[in-house]
């Protein structure tokens, strides 16, 4: 495979400009579909359409699958429904085809489905479209090798050969009974190495790991991670085999989930990228910035209440960034750890008290170390015992409070069915800033009121 480089990109653009379809086709033939998709994503609509038309139908389907979702939608809007059905969808796996069709307007969906030549494929796609895209049923594919438990191994091999052209990879053969209920699996190695006279029921692996069609993506990801499998069958409520999810589909979902959580942790309210228009980017970024602004206003009002303290002890203003920043960092660390455990499913109800207690113990150690370091610093540079005590004691309390809130808030959000990933972002930072300033001012005022 030829790797996409800046030099190759320049060559490909030259072939497009000079209408050299032969060289463009020859170069595309030696490239991976992912690299072709990356190249086409950056082209104008007209050039992208021309580039796709020089590809064989099978490779067009692979390239379309790998393209950026928004860019794919733009390009497909220029392609007739019949062409989408016969040249693209027909050469896709059912799960990829369902994802593509689901992303289009409803009237285009019906037109494309009506033009798919393979009625069985069209029916399978319609079945997948009925599932929520964030469930196991929404990401499974229908392409798989299914055999009856009463068949012989030669019959199993014949079925594998018959379906081989429709499958990119064959990980397992799925064994069902007469009612289509999944009762076992056959790894490909077992099919190859067992004597040809064996009956399937005697060599299959019974009670395989399964997913249900209504399982959430979190459950799907957790199951793949827990059992370290490359493919897991999906069944309905009656145990009937409905499809299979492969590891490549899960990796795609994990990447999308990670990107979404990273954006939420950064204070973005929706999935955006640099190619989105100004209004969409503004709408995604502005809400949390406005909330942060309101938090800052409350913070300034809070500090204004203690203006008499600043008048008496101007030095304490030097440590406001230290108090606020340390509290925010500690809260972010604690919330991130809890959110990760919740995402992995390793934090159940029984472990919550122990987790909070463990986090508080860690916070006590961190608070003690930070407070002592700041106390030593102030001893040499500030030389005011009350300032030293006020800053160090405030840091100690703020670190413990921030750690507690960072652990508890994601748990509370998870309990009320709000994505706890949001708690790792500006929400924790704003709250810790307010708490930090209140603690700092209260302790400072109390110490100076008592000792001076």
Label the model's feature ranges:
Residues 155-158, 433, 437-440:
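Extended alpha-helical regions
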Residues 40, 431-432:
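Intrinsic disorder/low-complexity signal
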Residues 112, 124, 399-404, 434:
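Mid-bilayer segments of alpha-helical transmembrane spans in multi-pass integral membrane proteins
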Residues 258-396, 400-404, 408-422, 426-431, ...:
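Alpha-helical transmembrane segments and their membrane-interface boundaries
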Residues 1-265:
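Hydrophobic packing positions in regular secondary-structure scaffolds
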